[in-house]
């Protein structure tokens, strides 16, 4: 790539000496130059100049190539107008020369020497130039021309020139390529020709690319699965080791210590005895519940006394500890330990024993006998004390309902 300084110098040179057109064909805005003569040429003509060889024409790009200072000085020393005027001033110049003849001539050699001298800062003169004795190289002749008759030199020369032009055109075509692109040449690679098997090659390359991507993804998946399995295995082994340690500390070690100390059999026997006692207690309680259910009686921990004895004892204690001035009904109601309730199965009132909670259908008879026992006990107590008190007459059974406050 040309530097900014190079572009600036070339821009200044372009506007001078008819350098804005191609020296060979007159095309506008040329982008290539022949540094050897300081002339500006187009892309097509630059290809033809390359065919001449670098000893006759050294071609450079204005924008794409790097430049040296000596090359920029040659561009200042030369130019399109200067080269044309110099060629026309020479005696051996022929306007009908071909490209090969023109640049292999003595006039072109003199101008090349002049450009080099001016670029190097030397003075140049036609008389002192070493190009005065320039001899153009003989053009190549075809093998068929060797057998031509020497009496036809002009035709042989014309044929050789035509053959050289054909060879030059073929060489130019090799540089430009089959596409004929205007910008194909030095610094611009021509596009490759498409072949019939390009489609197959592209398909195979796509297949290979897809397979390589698949193998890459599979390898990544396998590596990720391996890492996951390794991590899971490490965690599982860690948990198993923790569980084994806990089992060893909490179960195996205590059992082993007890076996060593001889306490394991004591613990087993105590556990069995406790279990047997629990089973025995549950069995006895169940048998007692079944017996109670079928007998219809609730059994307490101790046998309850008879009803008459209970009433007698309660009445005796009451008469000994209570005032005799109270009426019979008030004394009976306050001192009676049993509660009077109505049986749900009959209309009779029964006296419930506090110890056993039994029901009796003969409640009125028991109540009557209890009253008689209480009266007799009261008389005996009074006689022992030596004090005579009037005993109220026994109230008939049927009159008891009128005195109760229901």
UniProtKB/Swiss-Prot annotation:
Keyword Acetylation part of the UniProt annotation: yes
Arf-GAP domain boundaries: 7-124
One Pfam family cited in the UniProt record for this chain: ArfGap
CDD domains noted in UniProt: ArfGap_ArfGap1
C4-type zinc finger locations on the chain: 22-45
Residues recorded with modification Phosphoserine: 150, 246, 304, 343, 346, 348, 361, 363, 378
Stretches for region Disordered: 297-406
Residue list for modification Phosphothreonine: 135, 189, 350
GO molecular function list: GTPase activator activity; zinc ion binding
Main location, first listed in the record: cytoplasm
UniProt-listed SUPFAM superfamilies: ArfGap/RecO-like zinc finger
The UniProt record lists the keyword Ligase: no
Matching PROSITE patterns: ARFGAP
Protein localization: Cytoplasm; Golgi apparatus
Skewed-composition ranges (Polar residues): 307-329, 343-354, 369-379
Single GO BP term: protein transport
One term under GO cellular component: cytosol
Matches recorded under PANTHER family: ADP-RIBOSYLATION FACTOR GTPASE-ACTIVATING PROTEIN 1
Comment, domains: The region downstream of Arf-GAP domain is essential to GAP activity in vivo. This region may be required for its targeting to Golgi membranes.
Role of this protein: GTPase-activating protein (GAP) for the ADP ribosylation factor 1 (ARF1). Involved in membrane trafficking and /or vesicle transport. Promotes hydrolysis of the ARF1-bound GTP and thus, is required for the dissociation of coat proteins from Golgi-derived membranes and vesicles, a prerequisite for vesicle's fusion with target compartment. Probably regulates ARF1-mediated transport via its interaction with the KDELR proteins and TMED2. Overexpression induces the redistribution of the entire Golgi complex to the endoplasmic reticulum, as when ARF1 is deactivated.
Assembly notes: Interacts with ARF1. Interacts with the COPI coat proteins, KDELR1 and TMED2. The interaction with TMED2 inhibits the GAP activity.
Name the record gives this protein: ADP-ribosylation factor GTPase-activating protein 1
């Amino acid at each position: 790539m040309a530097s900014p300084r190079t572009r600036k110098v070339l821009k200044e040179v372009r506007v001078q000496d008819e350098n804005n057109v191609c020296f060979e064909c007159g095309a506008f805005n040329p982008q290539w130059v022949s540094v050897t003569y300081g002339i500006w040429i187009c892309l097509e003509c630059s290809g033809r100049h390359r065919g001449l060889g670098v000893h006759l024409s050294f071609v450079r790009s204005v924008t794409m190539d790097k430049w040296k200072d000596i090359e920029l000085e040659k561009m200042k020393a030369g130019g399109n107008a200067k080269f044309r005027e110099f060629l026309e001033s020479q005696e051996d110049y022929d306007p009908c020369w071909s490209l090969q003849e023109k640049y292999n001539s003595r006039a072109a050699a003199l101008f090349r020497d002049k450009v080099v001298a001016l670029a190097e800062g030397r003075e140049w003169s036609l008389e002192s130039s070493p190009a005065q004795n320039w001899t153009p190289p003989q053009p190549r002749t075809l093998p068929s021309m060797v057998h031509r008759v020497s009496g036809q030199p002009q035709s042989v020369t014309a044929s050789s020139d035509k053959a050289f032009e054909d060879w030059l055109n073929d060489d130019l075509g090799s540089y430009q390529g089959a596409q004929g692109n205007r910008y194909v040449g030095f610094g611009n690679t021509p596009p490759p020709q498409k072949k019939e098997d390009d489609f197959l090659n592209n398909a195979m390359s796509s297949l290979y690319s897809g397979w390589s991507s698949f193998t890459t993804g599979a390898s990544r998946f396998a590596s990720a699965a391996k890492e996951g399995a390794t991590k899971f295995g490490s965690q599982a082994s860690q948990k198993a080791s923790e569980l084994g340690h806990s089992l060893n500390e909490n179960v195996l070690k205590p059992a082993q210590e007890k076996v060593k100390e001889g306490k394991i059999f004591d613990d087993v026997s105590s556990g069995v005895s406790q279990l047997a006692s629990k089973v025995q207690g549950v069995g006895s309680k169940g048998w007692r519940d079944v017996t109670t259910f079928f007998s219809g009686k609730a059994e307490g921990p101790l046998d309850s006394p008879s009803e008459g004895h209970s009433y007698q004892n309660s009445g005796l204690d009451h008469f000994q500890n209570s005032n005799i001035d109270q009426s019979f009904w008030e004394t009976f109601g306050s001192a009676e330990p049993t509660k009077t309730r109505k049986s749900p199965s009959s209309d009779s009132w029964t006296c419930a024993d506090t110890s056993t909670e039994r029901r009796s259908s003969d409640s009125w008879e028991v109540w009557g006998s209890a009253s008689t026992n209480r009266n007799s006990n009261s008389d005996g107590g009074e006689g022992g004390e030596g004090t005579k008190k009037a005993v109220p007459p026994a109230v008939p059974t049927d009159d008891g309902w009128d005195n109760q406050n229901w």
